Amino acid sequence: MSMLFYTLITAFLIGVQAEPYTDSNVPEGDSVPEAHWTKLQHSLDTALRRARSAPTAPIAARVTGQTRNITVDPRLFKKRRLHSPRVLFSTQPPPTSSDTLDLDFQAHGTIPFNRTHRSKRSSTHPVFHMGEFSVCDSVSVWVGDKTTATDIKGKEVTVLAEVNINNSVFRQYFFETKCRASNPVESGCRGIDSKHWNSYCTTTHTFVKALTTDEKQAAWRFIRIDTACVCVLSRKATRRG
């Protein structure tokens, strides 16, 4: 604040020295009229009041290992390039039914941040017909307590668990999918010929845009989350006799 004050004073003094005064306006040798200084003081007071009342940039502060919720402009969520079907901001937990998780969850108190053509996502691999099974078993849940994550540069960042939007606290949820077990059956992946193949199930990742903070600067960043369970195969070495 003091820096702004000194800057305004300096700018004015430079302007006073550079202003071409006429004889009829300010006679040579006379000081600047008191009314002029009064006008200057009024201008400075107005500038300082505006500086004090101007909203500061949102900075997240860490308290006991957690991050305080920060105020976010709701217009920020209208940028389509930031949309992800796996990220949700809500004042209440998303539905967690055993059959499906509705990604178009639009109950009161939810930011329509994740609109997508995929209206529903299964929380577990479904069995469509009798006798059909998944090679790997997975489970999908909304994660609302994520505090840290790895960004696309491989750097660990702090995830903003909560943000303040229009004086309401919204929690940031991530829809994550991971493997139930690395070996659904004793030999590895289900349905794989273990005589010729080694196999195991593993969780894969993708990057989504999320609100994070790093070195007290809040910003959108790509972070890595679990998104699928796949089977990894490797051919067994054959002995040549």
UniProtKB/Swiss-Prot annotation:
Propeptide residues per the UniProt entry: 19-121
Localization, UniProt: Secreted; Endosome lumen
Residues bound to a 1-acyl-sn-glycero-3-phospho-L-serine: 171, 209
Glycosylation sites: 69, 114
Range of residues in the leader sequence: 1-18
Induction: Expression oscillates in a circadian manner in the suprachiasmatic nucleus (SCN) of the brain.
GO cellular component term, pick one: extracellular space
GO biological process, one term: positive regulation of phosphatidylinositol 3-kinase/protein kinase B signal transduction
GO molecular function: growth factor activity; lipid binding; metalloendopeptidase inhibitor activity; nerve growth factor receptor binding; transmembrane receptor protein tyrosine kinase activator activity
Tissue expr: Detected in submaxillary gland (at protein level). Highly expressed in male submaxillary gland. Levels are much lower in female submaxillary gland.
Pfam family, one: NGF
Primary location group: secreted
UniProt cross-references to PANTHER family, sorted A to Z: BETA-NERVE GROWTH FACTOR, NERVE GROWTH FACTOR NGF -RELATED
Cited function: Nerve growth factor is important for the development and maintenance of the sympathetic and sensory nervous systems. Extracellular ligand for the NTRK1 and NGFR receptors, activates cellular signaling cascades to regulate neuronal proliferation, differentiation and survival. The immature NGF precursor (proNGF) functions as a ligand for the heterodimeric receptor formed by SORCS2 and NGFR, and activates cellular signaling cascades that lead to inactivation of RAC1 and/or RAC2, reorganization of the actin cytoskeleton and neuronal growth cone collapse.
Similarity section: Belongs to the NGF-beta family.
Protein name: Beta-nerve growth factor
Phylogenetic classification of the source organism: Eukaryota, Metazoa, Chordata, Craniata, Vertebrata
Gene: Ngf
